Amino acid sequence: MIQRHHISSASFMMNLLHDNLYDWTIDIANSYDINPNFVLLSILGEIAGADRGHHHIVNENGQENILGLFVCISAPSGEGKSSAMQIILDIFKEYEKIENENFIQRENKIEAKRLILEAEKQEALDEAIISGDTSRLETIIGELKQSKENKLQPVRIFVNDVTAPAFAKTMESQGYVNLFDPDGVSWNENVYRQIAKYWAGEGHAELRITRQGSCVRNPFVNAVVFTQPEFFRKTIMAETQRAMGITARSILYAAPPYRRRGRGKPIGERTKDELRQKLMNLFNASKPDTQGNTPPTKYLRLGMGAAKILNEFNQEISHEVNLNGNGVRIRDWCVRASQQVLRITGIFH
C-alpha cells in the first residue's frame, strides 16, 4: 500500500489542475527555469493562506477539514526556492499594505475617542470630588480600560523566521497565521508546540493559546516552508515533532535534482493578473469587518461523484490493512492522506 501510494514527485497533480492553475504553474516555472513542483506547492499553500480559514470542506460523514496546509520542501541552494514564492509573496505584501491602511484609519479614530475620554475623565474626577458621586467617573474609566484591552495589532498576512511568542501573539491578534519561508531552517521546539496546540482540535474548537488565558475561535495555521536538505532531514526524523503529530499532518517533498534548460522568460501579464485577482478575491471574501469580526464560515461539500471516489479509496485502504501486518500504521497514514486530498480539493475549488 505504501509503495503503491508513495509520492516521490508532486508532478502527479499537474494532470488534475484546473487550466488556470496549470498555466500559472508552468508559466512561473518556465520564467525562472525552476522545478514546477516548487511553484505548484507554493500556489496551493498561498491560495489556502489567502482564504484564511474562511472555507471548510465537509466529507460525507459530516467531518470538517480546514483548508490549511503544512508543506515542507527540501532543496539545496540555487534551485530557485525564493523564485517559486516571489510573485505570490509580492501580492501578499500588497494586500497587507491595503489592510494596514484601513487599520491605521481605525486606530486614528480609536485614539481620537481615547483623547476625548481622557478629557471627560478629568471633568468627571472634578465633579466626583465636589459631589461624591463617582458613577460617571467609573463608567469612563471602564470605557478606557476596554479600549486598551481591545487595541488591535497591525495585520500580518504572513510571517517568516517566527518564534513561539511571535506565533502566539499573531494568532491571538487575528486568529490565523500564514507561515511562508523561502529559505527556512530548523525551528525551536516551542514553535512546534504552538502549532500542535492550534491543530489539537483540528481547527474547530476554542483553544487556549497564551499564558494569560486568551482564546481564539477556529484558529487557522497554514505554512509553506522551503529548507535545505540537512534541516529537512532533521525535521522529518525529529521524534518530538512526530510525537506531536506535526510530521503526520505535513506534505513533505524532497526535490530530486532539476535539470535546468536555460530558457527563462518574463512571466506573462495574464498570469500575473489572474493570480493577483484570484488571491485578492479570497482576501476580500475573508476580510474581517471594521469591528474585527470574521465573515461566517462557508462550507464546501463533496458531490456524489467525489464522495464515491473517496469511499472507494477508503474501502481499498480497509482491504489493504487486513492483508498487511503493518495495518495500523498504514491506516493512520491513509487517513491523513485522505484529509490532505480533501483540503487540496477545496483549494482547487
Stretches found by the model and what they are:
Residues 1-349:
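Phosphate-handling catalytic cores of nucleic-acid transaction enzymes
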